[in-house]
């Protein structure tokens, strides 16, 4: 029985990995063995960081809300507590957007939170 060397299957597999490794530095975009490891590691980083991104955005929103709240004489925690007591149910993403793009609306919310405290 003759020996089978892989041929098109091997070439297709290597091309797929090297295509994914396009743009990597050094040997990582040229040599199949190195590229294969880096593509695997890159996939792990992407998987991990898709989950971490949620927390990073939440931290960014809280920092923005806190800065705007302090400009209106409240701390972040007092603002959030005041909004909850006033029955204003807004998520942090919306509050951060208001803090950056519509300072007057945020100020009105801060006043409502102060009244509720």
Swiss-Prot record:
List, alphabetically, the PROSITE patterns matched. Answer: RIBOSOMAL_L20
* Keywords attached to this entry: Ribonucleoprotein, Ribosomal protein, RNA-binding, rRNA-binding
Q: Which GO terms describe its biological process?
A: ribosomal large subunit assembly; translation
State if Ribonucleoprotein is listed as a keyword: yes
What's in the GO CC field? ribonucleoprotein complex; ribosome
Q: Name one GO molecular function term.
A: rRNA binding
Q: Which family does it belong to?
A: Belongs to the bacterial ribosomal protein bL20 family.
The entry's function note states: Binds directly to 23S ribosomal RNA and is necessary for the in vitro assembly process of the 50S ribosomal subunit. It is not involved in the protein synthesizing functions of that subunit.
NCBIfam families in alphabetical order = rplT_bact
PANTHER family with a match to the protein in the record? 39S RIBOSOMAL PROTEIN L20
What is this protein identified as? Answer: Large ribosomal subunit protein bL20
């Amino acid at each position: 029985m003759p020996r089978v060397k892989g041929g098109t299957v091997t070439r297709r597999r290597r091309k797929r990995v090297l295509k994914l490794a396009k743009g990597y530095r050094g040997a990582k975009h040229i040599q199949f063995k190195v590229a294969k490891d880096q593509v695997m590691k890159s996939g792990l980083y992407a998987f991990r960081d898709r989950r971490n991104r949620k927390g990073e955005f939440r931290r960014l929103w809280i920092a923005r809300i806190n800065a705007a709240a302090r400009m209106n004489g409240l701390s972040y925690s007092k603002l959030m507590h005041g909004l909850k007591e006033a029955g204003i149910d807004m998520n942090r993403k919306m509050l951060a957007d208001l803090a950056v793009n519509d300072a007057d609306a945020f100020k009105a919310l801060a006043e409502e939170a102060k009244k509720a405290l």
